[in-house]
Amino acid sequence: MQATKSQALFVNFLGNSPKWYKYAIMAFLVINPLLFFYVSPFVAGWVLVVEFIFTLAMALKCYPLQPGGLLAIQAVFIGMTSPSQVLHEIEANLEVLLLLVFMVAGIYFMKQLLLFVFTKMITKVRSKIIVSLMFCTASAFLSAFLDALTVIAVIIAVAVGFYSIYHKVASGKSFNDGHDHTSETTEQLNNEELEAFRAFLRNLLMHSGIGTALGGVCTMVGEPQNLIIAAQAHWQFGEFFLRMSPVTMPVLVAGIFTCFLVEKFKVFGYGAQLPGAVHKILTDYANHEDSHRTNQDKMKLVVQALIGVWLIAGLALHLASVGLIGLSVIILATAFNGITDEHSLGKAFEEALPFTALLAVFFAIVGVIIDQELFAPVIQWALGYEGNMQLVIFYIANGLLSMVSDNVFVGTVYINEVKAALMSGQITRDQFDLLAVAINTGTNLPSVATPNGQAAFLFLLTSAIAPLIRLSYGRMVWMALPYTIVLSIVGVMAIESGFLVDMTDVLYETQLIIHHSAKDISGAVMGH
């Protein structure tokens, strides 16, 4: 019997999502205006934030752009925020959006080189612990110069490459045959082998993701909010690194040691070994590629390596905004490697654009948080403390909010509030500088707890690889837990023990950094 029009509309609504999920989103859309108009805009704002987090948590049931987008459109429509505020948020974060559009696409054209390097890593080194440490430290190093999103895009590209090679061969095809690696119906696949390989890839992706947080917190180009904090404090690349180092260096060592421990003792879903048969396929693929590599192919790798040098130099010296450097990577890589037809170019943008749209929706929710002043009580409470305790409170408050909200937003809001406190004479300039360190480390480190806080984690969760290797929201939170605990505690101990203040004094005495005055930043442009 044919469905009625109302039934057909319900079936079409959010597509293949479970019925309970569709009902939940519909309930949210009914409840929100009632709360806003008849209870309190403040309560409605926090409920909206929780609902949006729910859509992110259910990313594998339905991509968050649609349900989150509906909630955001309604929020603007009923007056929780305004279209101009949403546009202002997007303008303030344009660099992040350009980064997603261009840098991620640029990395797509460097995949051959990356696959070559990481394949060598996996095929030449048999110890899982050493491979894990290599992926974690390589991600940390790269994230100090590249944005964490760029690095995670690299690792995702590598993981998809490995997965598709294995899937193709295990499905009875040769390396050169066309194949759909997302197909779940292939009969030749050995399920136990496939599950073990999925677990192995999950381990490497999570170690890499944590690595991006460990490296990303250290420098002003590592994360988008670092750029905003550095701009407000008028710090250059070297000074930013030195001021952060009393917290970031102990955390880096602790993070790498945690990577070793979880692999050694096979806890929290780590310790999965690469099956022998899969290792053989990847080794055979590497040998096949090496033996069939023409001079043309070799020159492609050389060009990609040179572009990689330009990429790191351009970002480290901040020669242009991140997105524009990404655009230059696209142009150079395609021009010198002969990729000139539009269809081939288009594929590079498929991975990043849905996430770019999702981030724009995210900024609408940020608009609600700002307009309804949802974080104001927390910030005023934190400013009520003094001295070292104030630093600890700011670190913890930042950390808790970064676990549930985007850390770019949290860092931006806090640094502006602290700057306002400096301008009104509530705090000294030296205390402002210490608070900037507490805010930066607080937004970057505890936020690894959930995909909501780290844009790189959210990108991983909503990427094409996540469903293939069964990486769900809950599993990411569980696998990140040992890191969350260690990074958060080591970070707070570095501040609470007075180590940050003492080491900062040493840096002043040795004249590696200088005392700034409040006048320096009175003219700085506010991020929001």
From Swiss-Prot:
Keyword Transcription recorded: no
Coiled coil regions, renumbered to chain: none
> Does the record bear Transport in its keywords?
yes
* InterPro entries linked to this entry: Na+/H+_antiporter_NhaB
Membrane-topology descriptor: Multi-pass membrane protein
Q: Which Pfam families match?
A: NhaB
UniProt keyword annotations, A-Z: Antiport, Cell inner membrane, Cell membrane, Ion transport, Membrane, Sodium, Sodium transport, Transmembrane, Transmembrane helix, Transport
Cite a GO CC annotation: plasma membrane
Catalytic activities: 2 Na(+)(in) + 3 H(+)(out) = 2 Na(+)(out) + 3 H(+)(in)
Tell me, in one coarse class, where this protein mainly resides.
membrane
List, in alphabetical order, the Gene Ontology terms for molecular function in this entry: sodium:proton antiporter activity
Its transmembrane ranges are: 28-50, 67-87, 98-118, 140-160, 240-260, 305-325, 350-370, 391-411, 449-469, 476-496
What is the protein's known function? Answer: Na(+)/H(+) antiporter that extrudes sodium in exchange for external protons.
Q: Which NCBIfam families match?
A: NhaB (TIGR00774), PRK09547.1 (NF007093)
Q: What is this protein called?
A: Na(+)/H(+) antiporter NhaB
Taxonomic source organism? Shewanella frigidimarina (strain NCIMB 400)
Taxonomy, top ranks, is: Bacteria, Pseudomonadati, Pseudomonadota, Gammaproteobacteria, Alteromonadales
Gene label: nhaB
